[in-house]
Amino acid sequence: LEVIDLKQKILAVLLSFCCMISVTACGQSGPAFDAGTYTKGCLDAFLKKTFSEEYLKYSNSTEDEAKQAYEDSLDADVEALISESDNVSTALKKKYRDMFVQIYKNMKYEIGNVKDNKDGTYSVTVKTHRLIVFKNTIGPVEDYYASLSSKKQKKYTEEKLQMMIVDNVIDNMKTLEYDETPLDVTITVAPVENKKDQYAIDSEDYQRLYAAMMDGSEWAGDDSDDSAESTDSTEATAPPAAN
């Protein structure tokens, strides 16, 4: 395996993080709907596995259904990561899943100002503290691999290298580190087209929000500090509306 091939695979995985979580939600029109509570409920449900009464009401689901949606989301995350790989072991799938759980549950965010735009939409400011996830994860593995003789390199499968990198990511979560300067991301909560009393957050807004919640340039092999802008070209899965 060439190190550049490993970099390309990891970069592809990194860019897929922004489209992993799909949120199902609906709301009630009028004074009963709180866009800030709705936004926090969605994030808590799919990142923290925490389900408030308000979220269950807005998503029109039971707690068991919400828990299943969380588990299904993690399964989808793993499938997205391995979609172009053959014969991925159960052990690596489990490590990927554990990695997602650790990253998501340690994301830090607060709901700030909520503005009623008087056109049926709401602007919600989310203050995020970027989680340092990928620092010193791929570099050490690359250096170690490059230091091996060609004969020894042949003994390393791509999966084994992936396992080493994921282990580094999970180890990073043992000592949490966040950027000192918080980032404010304003998203729009809007009615779902042709769905009365249902609301959703635009997929591009989710993409910007997730990009602000964690680093990425280090893991992709880019030493710059422009990771907040590095996801502009990624695509996010549109969150479906609930029935």
Which residues does each predicted region cover?
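Positively charged n-region of N-terminal signal peptides that target proteins for export
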Residues: 2-10, 14
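Repetitive helical segments and hydrophobic/amphipathic motifs
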Residues: 17-18
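C-terminal motif of bacterial Sec signal peptides marking the signal peptidase cleavage site
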Residues: 22-25
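Mature, Sec-exported extracytoplasmic domains of Gram-positive
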Residues: 29-243
